[in-house]
Regions:
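Conserved SGNH/GDSL esterase-like catalytic core that processes O-acyl groups on lipids
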Residues: 2-6, 12-104, 127-129, 137-141, ...
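Glycine-rich phosphate-binding loop signature in dinucleotide/nucleotide-binding domains
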Residues: 67-71, 110-111, 193
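A short helix->loop->beta-strand "cap" motif at the edges of active sites that frequently abuts
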Residues: 107-115
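Histidine-centered active-site loop/cap adjacent to the catalytic His
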Residues: 170-194
Length: 194
């Protein structure tokens, strides 16, 4: 039986190819979302370049409606990279609080129809986009904050930081090998939950 899986995230969900300066994507055959699109899963990719954790009521409402109307049996949410990258003074704990507010709204609207898998992105590494060691240290705290959030909300959690996801030269975006490793990690997480 083919189930719907909605993947809600940023450029790493979108499939951004960091070798492209104009927002290009990896071929579909490379993207982790497409690798999960099998006879078991019909994957809906709702990744967007530059997306951060939603904070405005209108943005949250639109996202919640997208998730609810998809009627997906499972929803993977992976955000937070842009928050920490673009706001150097932002603490990982604040990302956790923002994520909790967003996911509370999702849970109210979906009323348990969808299994939510909150996924902490793999930590950034020094690269063309990442030079401040403080940003990298904060990123290493994000998984713990998200795990606490998931526990409080009673939803599933996965830490992509333990999946060996290779990042490209910029220290932020998945390489082709990274997409494959991430797809395997998500598949394992979903298999253990459903």
């Amino acid at each position: 039986m083919c189930r719907r899986l909605l993947c809600y995230g940023d450029s790493n969900t979108y499939g951004y190819d960091p070798r492209s300066y104009l927002g290009g994507r990896y071929p579909e055959s490379v993207r982790w979302t497409a690798l999960l699109n099998t006879e078991d899963w019909n994957v809906i990719n709702k990744g967007e370049n530059g997306r951060s954790i939603l904070r405005q009521d209108q943005e949250i409402g639109a996202a919640v409606n997208t998730i609810h109307l998809s009627k997906a049996e499972a929803v993977v949410v992976m955000l937070g990279s842009n928050d920490l990258l673009q706001c150097p003074g932002l603490a990982a704990e604040v990302c956790g609080e923002r994520m909790e507010r967003f996911l509370e709204a999702v849970l109210v609207q979906t009323q348990g129809e969808s299994m939510i898998l909150l996924t902490a992105p793999p930590p950034m590494e020094p690269g063309a986009w990442v030079s401040d060691p403080r940003t990298i240290r904060k990123f290493h705290k994000l998984a713990g904050c998200y795990e606490t959030t998931a526990h409080r909300l009673g939803i599933a959690f996965a830490d992509a930081g333990v999946w060996g996801v290779e990042l490209a030269y910029d220290g932020v975006h998945f390489s082709e090998k990274g997409h494959l490793a991430f797809a395997k990690g998500i598949q394992t997480a979903l298999d253990s939950l459903l």
